[in-house]
Amino acid sequence: MFPNSILGRPPFTPTHQQHNNFFALSPTLYSHQQLIDAQFNFQNVDLSRAVSLQPLTYGTVSPIQTSTSPLFRGRKRISDEKAFPLDGKRQRFHSPHQEPTIINQLVPLSGDRRYSMPPLFHTHYIPDIVRCVPPLREIPLLEPREITLPEAKDKLSQQILELFETCQQQASDLKKKELCRAQLQREIQLLFPQSRLFLVGSSLNGFGARSSDGDLCLVVKEEPCFFQVNQKTEARHILTLVHKHFCTRLSGYIERPQLIRAKVPIVKFRDKVSCVEFDLNVNNTVGIRNTFLLRTYAYLENRVRPLVLVIKKWASHHDINDASRGTLSSYSLVLMVLHYLQTLPEPILPSLQKIYPESFSTSVQLHLVHHAPCNVPPYLSKNESSLGDLLLGFLKYYATEFDWNTQMISVREAKAIPRPDDMEWRNKYICVEEPFDGTNTARAVHEKQKFDMIKDQFLKSWQRLKNKRDLNSVLPLRAATLKR
């Protein structure tokens, strides 16, 4: 996919191939979630040297050999999945120590729907002194928890379930994103050798659809030696280098790379092979933490994922699900759904951060945050409401019950709480608390016109759905299914 993803990795010295108890860590989930503690100075990055394709040497080790594969002789990559399986795409180097294929099966296949936690490959690593991705070894899979999708008790609930089963992200979709992430990480490590690239957001949190974009977080320095990156200066400088690298070295594989200078700057681009749109940020590590918090909520109760997906589809259809245009982000919408399910007379969800503070503490190191979903048992709610009733209740709650002027949505507290009087919250139309850093995830809604449009859509959709009890009345199913 990318020219430097074919670079090999030199064999490790015998001492580094042996297990070392000093560096032994708990099993980790991804090849890119590994403890890094070497120092670097991004201000002094030499881009001209970093992007060089000359063979690299590591001490007395032989230089890396580049592939002679015809796929990379200046021609566009062949995208026939059958002719070149995914597993094979990840091993294009001449090394006797090939890196085992790591497959993220975080989204269940159709045969895995009874599981709340799909099978996960866990890995651990042996640190290495050279600047390359350490070798990985598989360890036994975790046993998933059994869970069934809810029964459809009425027409509206059946429509919600059918839309969910059609549009939910598949394992094949996730594999494409993970393949791109792994190869991009190798490219970016030419600029920042100690960096790691994390796939975050809806791709991993259980709420993704087949059409979901990929969100990437570039961590230039991981914990415990993690430092804060100033998003206005350092992050923009780092992303400028990444953007330049994409434009100059990867133009044949990435299209439309664009540097967005927002509060949290990002590089937007599209992978030509998988046709997936990506957003890449720097050291916005709260996104890694909330990915696994949301994933735990997603699989805690079997009505959560179908309800969230249909609400995201509904909001997108009515043009109120686009933070770049002054409406609600998908993340804010998910938090709004979780908050509603927490505030019912018989709650469907609890506050995980209150019940399991040690699992969702910000003191948990990044390479361990993926353990949280595995440590939380299913939540047994006495609430037996159907999916249709819950969708109606969600629309009614925000149309007629929630006080937008004085209240803030808090999943952390599992209730609506008074707005803070800080500048960040003052004069804001919608306040949704980020569970980890306490910021306002709905700060993009800064125009009264957009706020009124959002409230109006909640009210109209609730009234229409209450009268007709047909999902088509608020979300045309044919159009929603075609978008997937």
Curated annotation (Swiss-Prot):
Phenotype on disruption: Mice are normal and healthy. Poly-A tail elongation in oocytes is not affected and mice are fertile.
Residues that bear Phosphoserine: S62, S69, S95
Tissue-wise expression: Ubiquitous. In brain, it is highly expressed in the cerebral cortex, cerebellum, hippocampus and olfactory bulb.
Cofactor(s) the protein requires to work: Mg(2+); Mn(2+)
Cellular-component GO terms for this entry: cytoplasm; nucleus
InterPro entries reported in the protein's UniProt record: MTPAP-like_central (IPR054708), NT_sf (IPR043519), PAP_assoc (IPR002058)
Keywords: ATP-binding, Cytoplasm, Magnesium, Manganese, Metal-binding, mRNA processing, Nucleotide-binding, Nucleus, Phosphoprotein, Transferase
Compartments where located: Cytoplasm; Nucleus
Annotated residues for binding of Mg(2+): D213, D215
Record bears the keyword Magnesium: yes
Gene Ontology biological-process entries: hematopoietic progenitor cell differentiation; histone mRNA catabolic process; mRNA 3'-end processing; negative regulation of miRNA catabolic process; target-directed miRNA degradation
Intervals of motif Nuclear localization signal: 76-92
Domain (PAP-associated): residue spans on this chain: 386-440
Main location: cytoplasm
Catalytic activity: RNA(n) + ATP = RNA(n)-3'-adenine ribonucleotide + diphosphate
The protein's Enzyme Commission number: 2.7.7.19
Main function: Cytoplasmic poly(A) RNA polymerase that adds successive AMP monomers to the 3'-end of specific RNAs, forming a poly(A) tail. In contrast to the canonical nuclear poly(A) RNA polymerase, it only adds poly(A) to selected cytoplasmic mRNAs. Does not play a role in replication-dependent histone mRNA degradation. Adds a single nucleotide to the 3' end of specific miRNAs, monoadenylation stabilizes and prolongs the activity of some but not all miRNAs.
Family per similarity comment: Belongs to the DNA polymerase type-B-like family. GLD2 subfamily.
Protein name (database record): Poly(A) RNA polymerase GLD2
